[in-house]
Amino acid sequence: MHTAEFLETEPTEISSVLAGGYNHPLLRQWQSERQLTKNMLIFPLFISDNPDDFTEIDSLPNINRIGVNRLKDYLKPLVAKGLRSVILFGVPLIPGTKDPVGTAADDPAGPVIQGIKFIREYFPELYIICDVCLCEYTSHGHCGVLYDDGTINRERSVSRLAAVAVNYAKAGAHCVAPSDMIDGRIRDIKRGLINANLAHKTFVLSYAAKFSGNLYGPFRDAACSAPSNGDRKCYQLPPAGRGLARRALERDMSEGADGIIVKPSTFYLDIMRDASEICKDLPICAYHVSGEYAMLHAAAEKGVVDLKTIAFESHQGFLRAGARLIITYLAPEFLDWLDEEN
């Protein structure tokens, strides 16, 4: 019979013993540079122009398109559990609403401005972030205004985006978050807010490091925002472009961004770390995007992972990389899970 063998060892060095530093659950929390809290969570809301809408999104488990009339019942239990912030995305479904310049984006009767006013009235404690983009509202599905050849008209695009951002702020948004990735839009938005006497009370949260890729499909299903032709690779960053991302971070910070979003998050932790160093005095926000969320759910449904465990692992990774805020479709679950952990 084989007998287990033990090699002779040297006496253990004092500096080699680490286990005593994390053998207790509280110690494991103390070892975390940042601990996930409810205040960090930002929950995306898809608000449709059908006020009574409540439609499940097949590719986004547990997420719905919601009309303004359904918001109160939907948000009330989440706010009671500690939800502090939402980010609004408008979904125009009425035929004929979309046009080449995204006129419906800041329509006073449209879903976003109606959503802002409703939430300000019924949930004044909620911090309202509005995504600023044109893709949901343009007939071509791109994020700006186009030239005749289908390329982005930068000047008209940033002028239009700035107008949308200012109108969201006028309606009561606490924060505007431009996600279009068109050069120079942060400067125009900031200038527009200054000229409207709104800059002192409107936070500009820039999607400075937003990458093109294959993780946005469920979102585009939810927002009905897929481009009708081409793709967005000429204005969203290439996945391998770390240097470009660093330049974009520096640019948006210099143009007046008050905070930075890195999107997607799981595959871009190096960019998140770069952002926390380049923009060290600004809050860094991770966006756990629809494709990442759907992947976790798919893996959990197959029994490959436990959803709660993998959700904490992924989101703690964002904090470790430098994020202080997280836009996440898992916010409702985390409101329960964090109570269980405590």
Swiss-Prot record:
Cofactor note: Binds 1 zinc ion per monomer.
Pathway involvement of the protein, from the record: Porphyrin-containing compound metabolism; protoporphyrin-IX biosynthesis; coproporphyrinogen-III from 5-aminolevulinate: step 1/4
GO cellular component assignments: cytoplasm; cytosol; nucleus
Keyword match Glycosyltransferase: no
GO molecular function: porphobilinogen synthase activity; zinc ion binding
Modified residues annotated as Phosphoserine in this record: S254
Signal sequence segment: none
Regulation of catalytic or functional activity: Inhibited by divalent lead ions.
Residues that hold Zn(2+) according to the record: C133, C135, C143
Active site positions: K210, K263
Oxidoreductase in keyword set: no
GO biological process: heme biosynthetic process; protoporphyrinogen IX biosynthetic process
Record's miscellaneous remark: Present with 11600 molecules/cell in log phase SD medium.
Quaternary structure, from the entry: Homooctamer.
Function: Catalyzes an early step in the biosynthesis of tetrapyrroles. Binds two molecules of 5-aminolevulinate per subunit, each at a distinct site, and catalyzes their condensation to form porphobilinogen.
Protein name per Swiss-Prot or TrEMBL: Delta-aminolevulinic acid dehydratase
Organism field: Saccharomyces cerevisiae (strain ATCC 204508 / S288c) (Baker's yeast)
